[in-house]
């Protein structure tokens, strides 16, 4: 590809992408969705303050939203203190989430940096997840825990998430080649 900008079609939307610098790509991820029935949640409730009971332990102040797929984020002191191999599938499949949900435990490092531990819906524990980075950044910004330009650190690498005044989300991160393939058109 010699183009600096392309459109990427996902299963539910079209994303604008552009090459930035030597090895970064920026995606326009659109706006987050907060309406309870579009996240979706089973019932109408405050999506910014969800409490879940998992095996007798309460997880409070969960923030649920949709950024192309559903997410719930819990802000905690240490995101690796919780065993997502056990908690992840229980929260993902909780009755509150009719389409299941991605699960993120996030710790605020400072007003521009967050470290996360992510359970990806249908995939399990993951080393990185773009939509989880976007959802976490939006939730932290709305809760006034961070600014609107945030670095999200995963086990493997990091992504930069920016939001404009209308909450349009821009995700930027490095690209690495996993496999090279040719296709004749």
Language model: regions and residue ranges:
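Helical hairpin unit composed of two closely spaced alpha helices linked by a short loop
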Residues: 131-133
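Active-site proximal loop and beta-alpha junction motif in alpha/beta enzyme cores
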Residues: 1-126, 138-185
């Amino acid at each position: 590809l010699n183009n600096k900008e392309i459109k990427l079609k996902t299963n539910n939307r079209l994303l604008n992408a552009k090459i930035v610098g030597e090895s970064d790509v920026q995606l326009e991820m659109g706006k987050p969705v907060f309406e309870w029935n579009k996240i979706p949640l089973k019932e109408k409730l405050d999506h910014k303050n969800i409490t879940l009971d998992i095996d007798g332990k309460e997880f409070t102040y969960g923030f649920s939203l949709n950024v192309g797929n559903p997410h719930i984020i819990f802000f905690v002191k240490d995101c690796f203190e919780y065993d997502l191999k056990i908690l992840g599938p229980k929260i993902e499949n909780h009755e509150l989430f009719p389409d299941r949900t991605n699960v993120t435990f996030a710790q605020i490092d400072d007003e521009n940096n967050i470290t996360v531990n992510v359970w990806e819906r249908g995939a399990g524990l993951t080393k990185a997840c773009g939509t989880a980075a976007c959802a976490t950044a939006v939730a932290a910004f709305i809760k006034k825990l961070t600014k609107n330009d945030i670095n999200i650190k995963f086990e493997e690498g990091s992504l930069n998430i920016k939001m404009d005044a209308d909450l349009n989300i821009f995700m930027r991160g490095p690209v690495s080649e996993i496999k090279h393939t040719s296709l004749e058109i």
